[in-house]
Design a protein with these regions (language model features):
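SAM-dependent methyltransferase catalytic region
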Residues: 1-141
Length: 141
């Protein structure tokens, strides 16, 4: 595995920008600001695949990356409630889908994702992925 300083993925770049633009002194306010920005970064990363094992590996990679960046920034692992919040976001943002039909593979059930609005508490609108692609979100009918 590549060390954090050598990674170039989109989420890695977002974490790097967050680290560069938030105070590093370990105060409660600074940690809260960093965490809010980090959760927004995770909320902005979406992906799907037909294969369930690829979905699992992608989810794991995002969650582990969050934990690694958190530990590097604050010198300790995130607490379980924080990990659970990230896991909830990741479970919605990385999903299994037939990309040609916008459905769960081998079914007629359309895939629903979250359009995140807040990080604390987690608040989001459910939208059909197909409608997002076709620009039919709740705010843009």
């Amino acid at each position: 595995p590549h060390t954090i300083s050598h990674r170039v993925g989109i989420l890695d770049r977002k974490f790097r920008v967050i680290d560069e633009n938030t105070p590093s002194e370990p105060t409660v306010a600074n940690k809260r600001l960093w965490l809010r920005k980090a959760l927004q970064a995770v909320q902005s990363v979406y992906g799907y695949d037909w294969q369930g094992d690829n979905v699992f590996l992608s989810r794991e990679s995002i969650l582990v990356s969050f934990c690694e960046y958190y530990a590097r920034r604050w010198g300790r692992r995130p607490k379980l409630p924080t990990i659970m919040k990230v896991a909830e976001i990741v479970s919605w943002n990385i999903w299994q889908m037939d990309g040609t039909r916008f459905t769960i593979p081998e079914t007629d059930c359309l895939c629903v994702i979250r359009e995140w609005r807040r990080t604390s508490p987690l608040v989001a609108d459910n939208i059909l992925f197909r409608d997002l692609i076709l620009k039919k979100t709740p705010n843009n009918k």
